[in-house]
Regions:
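N-terminal beta-alpha lobe that positions the nucleotide/phosphoryl donor
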Residues: 1-187
Length: 187
């Protein structure tokens, strides 16, 4: 498949960004041309991923105040990301993992700007962001899954009833969220 972009904004930091930069360098050694653009916040201005990228664009402070008055990570500020993508003339955006990689609104923003989002579609993120809907989808497709209660537990006593039905040990997980945060084993 022919790639239709050469300027890629890296919308992540640290190890994730470095991994992408090193992969791009490897491609470039093979005769490809992938221009890396590190999007970074003030505290990372001297970080290795910023120095090693072909180009770097500062997003500003690491956290910003959201419309609700609460602080949020700058990588989740869509207005800043839109400005960065436009000003750097990015043709693609690679979010890596975490941060904005799990935000369907960022995939939608990229589509609106004509920037290739390197990751799942916003629809796929929305569908799989809800773990209960994702398990039901997998079951419907005949994909083997770990035994489960088939529905969320509304309260502690219902969770206990479901656990007895499945048998111990069980794993308790929030229906949304990623990365195993909130994952608990009960015996």
């Amino acid at each position: 498949m022919k790639r239709s972009f050469s300027r890629v904004a890296i919308v992540n930091r640290g190890e994730a960004a470095l991994r992408f930069i090193h992969a791009a360098l490897e491609l470039n050694r093979e005769g490809e041309r992938l221009h890396t653009i590190a999007l970074y916040t003030e505290p990372d201005r001297h970080a290795a991923f910023v120095r090693q990228a072909d180009e770097a664009f500062e997003l500003g402070p690491a956290t910003v105040e959201g419309p609700d008055g609460r602080r949020k990570i700058a990588y989740l500020d869509l207005a800043r990301l839109e400005r960065a993508l436009r000003q750097t003339r990015a043709e693609a955006a690679w979010p890596g993992w975490g941060f904005v990689a799990e935000q369907p609104a960022f995939a939608d923003l990229c589509e609106r700007l004509g920037v290739t989002f390197i990751g799942p579609s916003a629809a796929a993120m929305s569908a799989l962001g809800d773990k209960i809907a994702a398990k039901r989808l997998a079951e419907g497709l005949g994909i083997p899954i770990v035994p489960w209660a088939g529905a969320p537990a509304a309260n502690e006593s219902e969770a206990e009833r479901q656990a007895l039905q499945i048998d111990f040990p069980v794993v308790i997980k929030a229906s949304s969220g990623t990365g195993g945060r909130g994952l608990r084993e009960a015996e």
